[in-house]
Amino acid sequence: MIYKLKLIFLIFFLYGHVAHAISIEDFKNLEGQSSFKVQKVNKYIDYFSQNRKGRDFFQAAYPRLGLYKDIIYEIFDEYNIPREIIFVSMLESGFNPKIESSAGAIGLWQFMPSTAEIFGLRIDEWVDERMDIYYSTNAAVSYFRSLLKKFGSWELALAGYNCGDLN
C-alpha cells in the first residue's frame, strides 16, 4: 500500500509536467535533472525498473493504458481532474477493468461495494458498473472531488483514496 502511494506522489507531484513520457526509463533519466534525492522514492523507481516482478507489472499494465486513456482523459478534462491521476488506476488495477482484489475491490479504480454504492455505481446480479470504464471513471472523479474538497490538497486526497471508504 505504501509503495503505491509513494509512486503516485512520484508521478504526480515530481514529474507531473512530463507525465506524458511514461516509461520507467524516462523516469530514471529524469532523476538526474531533478533536485530531489529521496532514497525511498528511488527505491520504487528501482522496483519498477530493475525488479522482475515490478518490471513485469509495469510492462503488462502500460500497453493497456492506450485502451482507456482517451475515455478517461475526456472525463478528467470535463471535471478539471489532473490527467496524472490516471496512474492511480495503473497502480490499483494495472488498467484491467475486470480485476478483483482479494478484499473484493473490482475494476480499474478498485471500488469496494460500499464505496461504489456511495458514488452511484450499480452492482447487482446482472451488472457490475465497477467494471465499466465510463461509469467507474465518473464515480472515481466524484470520489476524488469529494476527497479534494474534504482534505484541501491532492496529496491528502490521494492518501484518502488509497485508504478507501472515505476513512
Task: Set out the residue ranges of the language-model regions.
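Sec-dependent N-terminal signal peptides
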Residues: 5-15
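Short, functionally critical alpha-helical segments immediately adjacent to catalytic or ligand/cofactor-binding
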Residues: 81-97, 157-162
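Short, intrinsically disordered, charge-balanced linker/junction segments flanking boundaries
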Residues: 164-167
